[in-house]
């Protein structure tokens, strides 16, 4: 099997950048803003030209949860034929052979190949529709709580490079993300896995080309988000001065385990857990916060009590011109506010049991 990922061709497609930009804009539009800012908009987005480092940890059947999402109105009467997204496909027998024989790591960067090759499908058309699919807000409190409890039970926040065992049994669609990761853990004292048989209705929905990849992704690139916002000076009176500022958010660092599922006419994406690095930093490094600084770094670390951070590090550069010191301090507040909201949005919308769906039916 061969995977050929042309990152430069992917990021040059404006439909991808625009879809993500619209997604972020819709999320920010629903955020409750503090009294000192208004008119928060996402003015630009770019994936950047630096590709992430990807190591495939497992290839298997897709999670049942994705088929529950396929039951929605979007897929009523939808055909089971697959669309192209830059990843070639082999026949079903080749897929099974590859899954059974996967015992090592496959590293992907900008272009990756393995020994057995097949003709890749053309990169275009690329999906132009980014759908918000299953999220924790759509699930019942009990079901969301159950998902999180299972992840806590296996301490997935601290999964590291040495904790994955590719010689374990090949996972199937009956497995949850927690069970997948548990099967790849080393150590004789790992708790047993209790699987529930797949229902006949779920089996009937599976297409012969449906496939799921569990991969470790490490990203330290130049993804760029441009945000414009009006900053208010509320002294000596409310909204005494309105100052438009532009913020460039970049320097994202991510090291996580992800799930990518390809089924029928859609690609599903979800972060499963963070992968621990050798060194960790403080939750926030706000050394430049008081001065505004025009350049601030924010680092998340082990002090964060959330299950998953996803974004380990991010930088913000502000364009405000020559202004007074008290204005710079307010800009520092805006920067910190944006970082917290971006991390929250990414975590809530893309971390399991939430996911993003790239609708390829159009």
Curated annotation (Swiss-Prot):
Component of the ER-mitochondria encounter structure (ERMES) or MDM complex, composed of MMM1, MDM10, MDM12 and MDM34. A MMM1 homodimer associates with one molecule of MDM12 on each side in a pairwise head-to-tail manner, and the SMP-LTD domains of MMM1 and MDM12 generate a continuous hydrophobic tunnel for phospholipid trafficking. Keywords: Endoplasmic reticulum, Lipid transport, Lipid-binding, Membrane, Mitochondrion, Mitochondrion outer membrane, Transport. Residues 192-201 have a biased composition (Low complexity). Residues 1-361 form the SMP-LTD domain. Pfam families: MMM1. InterPro entries: Mdm12, MMM1_dom, SMP_LBD. The SMP-LTD domain is a barrel-like domain that can bind various types of glycerophospholipids in its interior and mediate their transfer between two adjacent bilayers. It comes from Meyerozyma guilliermondii (strain ATCC 6260 / CBS 566 / DSM 6381 / JCM 1539 / NBRC 10279 / NRRL Y-324) (Yeast). GO terms for molecular function: lipid binding. It is a peripheral membrane protein. Residues 106-119, 170-187 have a biased composition (Polar residues). PANTHER family: MITOCHONDRIAL DISTRIBUTION AND MORPHOLOGY PROTEIN 12. This is Mitochondrial distribution and morphology protein 12. It is found in: Mitochondrion outer membrane; Endoplasmic reticulum membrane.
């Amino acid at each position: 099997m061969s995977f050929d990922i042309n990152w430069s061709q992917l990021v040059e497609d404006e439909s991808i950048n625009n879809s993500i930009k619209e997604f972020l804009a819709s999320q920010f539009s629903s955020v409750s803003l503090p009294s000192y800012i208004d008119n928060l908009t996402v003015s630009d987005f770019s994936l950047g030209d630096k590709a992430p480092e990807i190591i495939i940890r497992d290839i298997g059947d897709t999670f049942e949860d994705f088929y529950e999402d396929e039951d929605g109105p979007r897929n009523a009467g939808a055909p089971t034929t697959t669309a192209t997204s830059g990843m070639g496909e082999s026949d079903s027998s080749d897929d099974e052979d590859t899954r059974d024989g996967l015992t090592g790591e496959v590293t992907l960067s900008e272009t990756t190949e393995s020994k057995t090759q097949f003709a890749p499908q053309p990169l275009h058309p690329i999906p132009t529709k980014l759908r918000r699919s299953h999220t924790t807000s759509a699930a019942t409190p009990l079901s969301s709580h159950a998902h999180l409890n299972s992840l806590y039970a296996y301490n997935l926040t601290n999964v590291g490079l040495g904790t994955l065992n590719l010689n374990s049994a090949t996972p199937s669609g009956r497995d949850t993300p927690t069970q997948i990761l548990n099967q790849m853990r080393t150590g004789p004292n790992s708790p047993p896995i209790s699987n529930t048989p797949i229902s006949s209705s779920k089996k009937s929905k599976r297409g012969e080309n449906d496939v799921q990849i569990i991969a470790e992704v490490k990203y330290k690139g130049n993804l760029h988000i441009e945000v414009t916002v009006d900053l208010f000076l509320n002294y000596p009176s409310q909204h005494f001065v309105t100052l438009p500022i532009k913020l460039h958010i970049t320097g994202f660092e991510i090291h996580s385990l992800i799930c990518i599922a390809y089924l029928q006419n859609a690609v599903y994406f979800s972060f499963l857990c963070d992968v621990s690095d050798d060194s960790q930093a403080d939750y926030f490094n706000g050394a430049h916060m008081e001065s505004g600084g025009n350049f601030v770094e924010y680092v998340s670390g082990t002090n964060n009590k959330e299950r998953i951070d996803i974004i380990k590090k991010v930088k913000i550069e502000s364009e405000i011109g020559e202004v007074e010191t008290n204005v710079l301090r307010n800009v520092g507040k805006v920067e910190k506010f944006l970082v917290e909201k971006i991390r929250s949005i990414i975590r809530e919308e893309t971390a399991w049991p939430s996911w993003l769906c790239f609708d390829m039916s159009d």
